[in-house]
Regions:
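Conserved small/polar residues in nucleotide/adenosyl-binding loops
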Residues: 124-130
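Short, charged amphipathic alpha-helical surface segments
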Residues: 31, 51-52, 56, 61-114
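Basic helix-turn-helix/winged-helix DNA-binding cores
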Residues: 1-61
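Glycine-rich, often proline-containing surface loops adjacent to acidic residues and nearby aromatics
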Residues: 112-123
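A very general structural signal that marks isolated residues within well-ordered alpha-helical segments
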Residues: 45, 90, 130-131
Length: 131
């Protein structure tokens, strides 16, 4: 199947498909008569899997390790879940800081007292429920 067909079947751009090939995540065969790439059903399924894992924030390097069998998908998902939980915590702290600052009357750069907000959020962070 041609790359145009792969684009239609996966919803990905030509450049994404080529990037996955360049990164050795897929290796389509070549048509001997013209040298064009010939993508298989298996290539399309792998592209879909790779794209899905990317939406979960899993790196190309980690996906390569999964495909090569160096790590399992389960191990990678567990590690990614920890990373996402940490990012959620950091984002919640940033959100709390923004809300605290927005609650102030006429906040400005000149009046910004960083220690006041960081201390308040650090204390609040310790009392946040974890999920």
């Amino acid at each position: 199947m041609k790359i145009k067909d792969v684009e239609e079947r996966t919803g990905l751009s030509r450049s994404n498909v080529r990037f996955y090939e360049k990164e050795k995540l897929i290796e389509p065969s070549r048509n001997e008569s013209n040298g064009y790439r010939d993508y298989s059903e298996n290539d399309v399924e792998n592209i879909k899997k790779i794209a899905y894992l990317r939406t979960l924030g899993i790196s190309i390097e980690d996906i390569r390790s999964i495909i090569s069998g160096k790590v399992t998908l389960q191990e990678t998902l567990e590690r990614q879940n920890e990373i996402l939980n940490s990012q959620i915590t950091d984002l919640n702290k940033a959100k709390l800081m923004c809300e605290k600052m927005l609650g102030e009357e006429s906040i400005s750069y000149e009046k910004l007292q960083v220690e006041q907000y960081v201390t308040a959020v650090s204390y609040t962070h310790l009392t946040l429920p974890t999920t």
